[in-house]
Design a protein with these regions (language model features):
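Conserved N-terminal entry element of GNAT/NAT acetyltransferase domains
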Residues: 1-11, 22, 31
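Conserved GNAT-fold acetyl-CoA-binding loop/helix
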Residues: 25-48, 58-59, 83-85, 93-94
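Conserved acetyl-CoA pyrophosphate-binding loop and the N-cap/start of the following alpha-helix
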Residues: 120, 124-132
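A short helix-loop-beta-strand connector motif used in the catalytic cores of GNAT acetyltransferases and
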Residues: 49-62, 79-83, 110
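Hydrophobic adenine-recognition pocket in adenosine-nucleotide-binding enzymes
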Residues: 8, 114-116
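Glycine-rich acetyl-CoA-binding "A-motif" of GNAT/NAT acetyltransferases
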Residues: 68-71
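Conserved GNAT acetyl-CoA-binding A-motif
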Residues: 107-109, 130, 137-147
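Conserved acyl-donor/pantetheine-binding loop and adjacent beta-alpha core of acyl/acetyltransferases
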Residues: 74-113
């Protein structure tokens, strides 16, 4: 099994959304927003395809196995958190959990949602993606990365 760790692509937004949703309390999000799983997935896909969001493909590194996106993780400069989370609040509403969270701040490169498809878990894929995001943080000049 060859695992390729690389930058995500815009056309992979749907797969990225699916993987991020594996890391979230989806049932709570659906209940609090009155959405179906499909509606949430569609909304997160649009967000992942956008450049100016937390969950953007530009902030995401993926693990590819046999041409399939098997894992993903987004990470970003904490100084941009408030601005980058606004598109999510716009989609899910001001009462969503995302609106109330303050996960990071300036001075930290924040390692956010990581998801791996169930059939690929237990193979060190998440660890490799996290390592790649930490390397990305260093390349971008960050001295602190947090999860």
């Amino acid at each position: 099994m060859d695992v390729i760790i690389r930058q995500a692509r815009k056309e992979e937004a749907s797969q990225i959304a699916e993987l991020f949703m594996l890391a979230w309390p989806v049932d709570d999000i659906l209940e609090s927003n009155g959405l179906t799983y499909e509606q949430l997935h569609e909304s997160i896909t649009l967000i992942a395809a956008n450049e100016e969001t937390i969950y953007s493909y530009e902030n995401t590194i993926v693990a590819e196995i046999d041409g399939k996106v098997a894992g993903a993780m987004c990470a970003y400069d904490g100084a941009d958190y408030q601005r980058l989370k606004q598109p999510i609040v716009d989609v899910l509403g001001p009462d969503c959990g995302f609106a109330k969270m303050k996960e990071t701040e300036a001075g930290e490169f924040y390692l956010d949602s990581v998801g791996v498809l169930p059939e690929y878990r237990g193979r060190g894929i998440a660890s490799r993606i996290i390592e790649a995001q930490c390397e990305r943080a260093a390349t971008l000049g960050h001295k602190v990365a947090g999860l």
